[in-house]
């Protein structure tokens, strides 16, 4: 069996994950070939190459995923599931629709402090209470996420999100993380106001799920910030995952149709968990278990 592991061209070639994936695949009888994409279009290198048995896409190149799907090739993750999990409001809607606990989230809007369509601080706090979270629709690693407790912090966060919006549009690089068209980039630059779960301040549990099974989990924490992300200075350590936490993570991944996912669980006072975000392209450097092995042992091709 042959699979293609496809990364954005911006990925450092020194990334150890390449060998981790390839070694784990080989141990499970799979030959994995590594490719890189450098364009928002489906490049000729993929159209001319022999079709693999499956594609493992380490990025958000939706057109490439759709092209392989049109050829009858299994893509991990599917284009539909990646569209859902990349957009934090679509994620909220799907989880909420299925009754999976997740922070209350208001409809997205453009981050322009001077526009009439931007809700005021008072409007957001009336619906979500204060403090609340402000974040952009597309993004990861805790970037462009703000804790809002006063009108001034709201104004400053909107200005920073607006600057990020202009940067994404102005660069016209069409980075697949933020979209492959200007319309997608515009959508991804919109912001959402979200309920803040104060009981879980600075800590969450990242759960890696593959084909409906938990293959790893880790407690992430930060004593100096409300963000627990490792990329934002957080730390990590092993922890036990209660059955209800595993159930929440599996349900969230399945709700979005993800074969492989990283699910971030917030702690609730009643001992339950709330799904903060679901990542269809999760890293796993902080994992204490062999995530690639877990993937290829459980993957259904």
Describe each model-derived feature in a short phrase.
Residues 4-7, 82-191:
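Active-site nucleotide/adenylate-binding loops and adjacent lid/helix of ATP-dependent enzymes
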Residues 6-113:
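Conserved N-proximal alpha/beta basic substrate-recognition cap immediately N-terminal to
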Residues 60-62, 81, 213-214, 220, ...:
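Short glycine-enriched loops at secondary-structure junctions
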Residues 132, 215-216, 261, 274:
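Protein kinase-like catalytic core scaffold
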Residues 133, 208, 266-268:
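Conserved protein-kinase catalytic-loop segment immediately C-terminal to the catalytic Asp
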Residues 143, 147-248:
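Phosphate-binding site of ATP-dependent enzymes
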Residues 236-240, 254-258, 267-301:
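C-terminal active-site "lid" helix and adjoining low-complexity regulatory extension at the edge
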Residues 249-253:
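A conserved acidic, glycine/proline-rich C-terminal tail/linker
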């Amino acid at each position: 069996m042959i699979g293609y592991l496809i990364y954005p061209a911006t990925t450092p070639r020194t990334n150890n994950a390449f060998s981790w994936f390839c070694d784990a695949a080989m141990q499970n009888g799979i030959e994995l070939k590594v490719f890189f994409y450098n364009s928002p279009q489906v490049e000729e290198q993929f159209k001319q190459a022999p079709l693999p048995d499956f594609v493992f896409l380490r990025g958000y190149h939706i057109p490439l995923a759709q092209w392989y799907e049109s050829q009858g090739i299994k893509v991990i993750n599917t284009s539909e599931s990646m569209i859902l999990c990349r957009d934090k409001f679509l994620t909220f809607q799907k989880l909420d629709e299925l009754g999976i606990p997740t922070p209350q989230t208001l409809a997205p809007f453009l981050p322009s402090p001077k526009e009439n369509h931007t809700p005021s601080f008072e409007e957001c706090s009336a619906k979500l209470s204060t403090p609340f979270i402000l974040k952009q629709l597309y993004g990861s690693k805790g970037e462009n996420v703000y804790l809002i407790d006063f009108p001034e912090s709201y104004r400053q966060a909107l200005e920073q999100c607006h600057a990020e919006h202009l940067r994404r549009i102005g660069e016209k690089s069409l980075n697949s993380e933020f979209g492959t068209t200007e319309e997608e980039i515009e959508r991804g630059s919109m912001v959402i106001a979200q309920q803040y779960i104060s009981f879980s301040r600075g800590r969450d549990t990242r759960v890696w799920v593959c084909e409906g099974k938990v293959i790893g989990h880790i407690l992430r924490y930060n004593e100096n910030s409300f963000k627990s992300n490792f990329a934002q200075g957080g730390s990590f350590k092993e922890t036990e995952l209660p059955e209800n936490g595993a159930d929440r993570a599996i349900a969230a991944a399945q709700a979005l149709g993800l074969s492989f996912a990283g699910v971030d669980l917030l702690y609730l006072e009643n001992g339950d968990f709330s799904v903060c975000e679901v990542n269809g392209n999760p890293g796993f450097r902080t994992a204490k278990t062999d995530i690639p092995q877990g993937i290829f042992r459980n993957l259904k091709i």
